[in-house]
């Protein structure tokens, strides 16, 4: 992949056969090191060597350039892993900016300096053109890293959101709109040959990709824009066309680099916000000790289940459980053991719940389970399995529970009525057990 991308990139080398303003291999190489680790460096060295050996220069200059490209990737990977979150650099805006500076601006000076110096020492590039060749080399590598590395990293991740049909249609509409506008600005309209500064027309579609999707889709949208923009600019159309092809590409790459960084940072910031909102919501509806639904969520689910059952005419059941003798456990063995007892009971409840059931901590030593489309008889069977599981548990102290059952609508048609009904059964069970013990 490095070799093929390198040969394609050097087809756009105008200031020198070995220096191109469009250099995707730098991004591919850095992505390979971030994904596979530093052990991937021999492949980069070999690919860079073959690309340059089959293009221009001598064996010595090809080795020098290959060493520079490999060191650039190694330095960039080390800096990103150390200071920018490694492969997670595009999940936070702060790390995205760090990645841009460390990998896109700092590490790229290594390849540009070693590469141009090797060519100049070998007599394949005049020293008078050192600055212009170096600038082209550096910018090509920088934009290649900023644009290609995120794309490869994000698509290699397995943590992808599954799209609904509506989501897929929206993505397709976005891609078509972006391609059409990019074509209008850079390629085939009556406006493109006039070089009007219309590149800003593409930005809303990149914002769309970042706002509605993830950094992965934003990086993909940037690639689509870049492909059309480079094609149009090389054919003499678009706002960045100048007297020489290399000057045109340098201006275009500067624009693409800035747009890429801003789009990826915006997408990362939005992704951060979504994760924070999801985390806050999870904490708001989850019991921090047991990981079960908390009182707030239990009441919300109970109200929702009442509405569903009222529409469908199907009953549902509610189990109310009380962990027996929790105070004695706390007094005799300490609160850590008491907390562990609550977690043990929570694990048992999870094990005997269906995916559609909602187990939760009602408060203190009380738990509840909402059983959709279940009768009181079915709920009693679940209660029996919970009793049996606790009796078989070999961990000390031995746990026992009292359980009350209520069925909608037989025992009540409101949240309060169902809870009172289940609590009456639970209290009666406790009294009966107390009489048996005494």
Enumerate the predicted regions with their spans.
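Hydrophobic transmembrane alpha-helices
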Residues: 1-49, 53, 78, 85-99, ...
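Catalytic/regulatory signature loops of cyclic-dinucleotide turnover enzymes
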Residues: 391-399, 418-438
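Signal-transducing coiled-coil linker helices
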Residues: 200-201, 245, 250-288, 296-307, ...
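Active-site-proximal alpha-helical element of nucleotidyl cyclase-like catalytic domains
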Residues: 301, 337-358, 366
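Conserved nucleotide-binding and Mg2+-coordinating catalytic segments in signaling enzymes
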Residues: 281-300, 321-334, 343
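A short pre-motif secondary-structure segment
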Residues: 358-361, 397
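Alpha-helical scaffold within the catalytic cores of cyclic-nucleotide enzymes
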Residues: 345-350, 378-396, 423
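Conserved metal-coordinating catalytic motifs of nucleotidyl cyclase and c-di-GMP turnover enzymes
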Residues: 141, 287-290, 319-322, 364, ...
């Amino acid at each position: 992949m490095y070799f093929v991308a390198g040969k394609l990139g050097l087809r756009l080398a105008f200031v020198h056969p070995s220096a191109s303003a469009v250099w995707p291999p730098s991004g591919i190489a850095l992505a390979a090191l971030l994904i596979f680790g530093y052990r991937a460096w021999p492949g980069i060295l070999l690919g860079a060597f073959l690309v340059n050996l089959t293009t221009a220069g001598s064996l010595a200059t090809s080795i020098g350039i290959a060493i520079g490209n490999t060191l650039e990737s190694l330095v960039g990977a080390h800096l990103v892993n150390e200071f920018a979150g490694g492969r997670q650099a595009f999940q936070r805006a702060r790390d995205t900016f760090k990645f841009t500076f460390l990998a896109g601006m700092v590490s790229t000076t290594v390849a540009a300096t070693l590469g141009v110096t090797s060519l100049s020492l070998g007599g394949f590039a005049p020293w008078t053109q050192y600055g212009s060749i170096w600038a082209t080399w550096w910018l090509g590598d920088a934009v290649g890293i900023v644009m290609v590395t995120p794309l490869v990293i994000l698509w290699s991740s397995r943590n992808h959101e599954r799209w609904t049909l509506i989501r897929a249609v929206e993505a397709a509409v976005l891609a078509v709109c972006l391609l059409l506008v990019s074509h209008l600005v850079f390629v085939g309209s009556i406006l493109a040959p006039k070089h009007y500064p219309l590149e800003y027309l593409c930005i809303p579609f990149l914002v769309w990709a970042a706002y509605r999707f993830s950094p992965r889709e934003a990086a993909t949208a940037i690639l689509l824009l870049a492909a059309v923009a480079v094609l149009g600019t090389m054919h003499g159309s678009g706002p960045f066309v100048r007297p020489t092809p290399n000057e045109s590409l340098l201006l275009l790459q500067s624009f693409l680099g800035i747009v890429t960084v801003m789009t990826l940072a915006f997408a990362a910031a939005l992704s951060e916000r979504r994760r924070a909102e999801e985390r806050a919501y999870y904490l708001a509806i989850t019991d921090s000790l047991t990981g079960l639904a908390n009182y707030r969520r239990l009441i919300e689910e109970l109200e929702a289940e009442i509405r569903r059952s009222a529409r469908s005419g199907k009953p549902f059941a509610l189990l109310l459980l009380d962990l027996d003798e929790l105070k004695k456990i706390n007094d005799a063995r300490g609160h850590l053991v008491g907390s562990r007892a609550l977690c043990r009971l929570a694990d048992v409840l999870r094990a005997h719940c269906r995916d559609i059931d909602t187990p939760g901590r009602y408060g203190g030593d009380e738990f509840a389970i909402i059983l959709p489309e279940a009768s009181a008889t079915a709920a009693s069977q679940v209660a029996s399995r919970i009793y049996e599981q606790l009796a078989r548990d070999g961990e000390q102290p031995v746990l026992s529970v009292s359980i009350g059952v209520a069925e909608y609508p037989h025992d009540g048609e409101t949240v309060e009525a169902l809870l009172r009904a289940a609590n009456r059964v639970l209290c009666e069970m406790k009294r009966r057990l107390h009489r048996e013990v005494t």
